[in-house]
Amino acid sequence: MGLWAELCISLRGLSFFLVLMTGEGTRGGSFKESLGVCSKQTLLVPLRYNESYSQPVYKPYLTLCAGRRICSTYRTTYRVAWREVRREVPQTHVVCCQGWKKPHPGALTCDAICSKPCLNGGVCTGPDRCECAPGWGGKHCHVDVDECRASLTLCSHGCLNTLGSFLCSCPHPLVLGLDGRTCAGGPPESPTSASILSVAVREADSEEERALRWEVAELRGRLEKLEQWATQAGAWVRAVLPMPPEELRPEQVAELWGRGDRIESLSDQVLLLEERLGACACEDNSLGPSLRG
């Protein structure tokens, strides 16, 4: 076997020896317990490898000594030689608990197994257990947490929930502070701009109120017609019910239920619009034109 082949074999054996001595996944050869490790075994593994060393070589030669005599002596030189080394080295082997696995076969740690991945930055910290990032919840970190409904007040005024977070808002003329949560006074406005804004707001409120009143009136008219029909239908039902139920035609039953659903829906719409109208207030706390007198 040539010198180059012996060198390759020795380097492979030495690298394997160093891996076993340092320990896979550890530093300084020390083993650190981790979560999910059920058992640990340290075995002595026989290892055979080649190592290099300096071999002395003695070369004799003749020289001239004192008295003109010829003397025999030698000089020492060194060359790189190889020798086979056998020794037993400790090797640690771990067994993972149920619900845990090794990241690779030679690892000394175990990672948790989650049947479904942890979403939105979540981390699998135990068997089918996710540790979610702030703003997310649920078993797999797939549910957005509504911070605005939390018991802890996050915003001094308005709060808008977003995916994984929230935003704070401020009413006019306040502005959001540097902390992004509290409101502070904004820059002073000129009287002209303030008066223009006030007029625009009053005009917008007036137009919205007229539109709401027209919509309420229209819905009330439709509701009155349906109530009249319901009265007539009630009399028809009372006249029909004494007959056996199997004699009722399916289209009559379907029409009766459909009209009833429309009446209920219109009643809800009218109630909602009346509540919105009741929330309107004049600037000087006076009654509107329709409520005076």
Swiss-Prot record:
Ubiquitously expressed in brain, kidney, thymus and lung. GO terms for cellular component: extracellular region. SUPFAM superfamilies: EGF/Laminin, Growth factor receptor domain. CDD domains: EGF_CA. Residues 1-28 form the signal peptide. Keywords: Calcium, Coiled coil, Disulfide bond, EGF-like domain, Glycoprotein, Repeat, Secreted, Signal. GO terms for molecular function: calcium ion binding. The keyword Calcium applies. It is found in: Secreted. Residues 206-235 form a coiled coil. Disulfide bonds join C38-C97, C65-C71, C96-C110, C114-C124, C118-C130, C132-C141, C148-C159, C155-C168, C170-C183. Residues 34-112 form the EMI domain. InterPro entries: Dev_Signal_Modulators, EGF-like_Ca-bd_dom, EGF-like_dom, EGF-type_Asp/Asn_hydroxyl_site, EGF_Ca-bd_CS, EMI_domain, Growth_fac_rcpt_cys_sf, NOTCH1_EGF-like. Residues 111-142, 144-184 form the EGF-like domain. Glycans are attached at N50. Its main location: secreted. PANTHER family: EGF-LIKE-DOMAIN, MULTIPLE 7, 8, EPIDERMAL GROWTH FACTOR-LIKE PROTEIN 8. This is Epidermal growth factor-like protein 8. It comes from Mus musculus (Mouse). The gene is Egfl8.
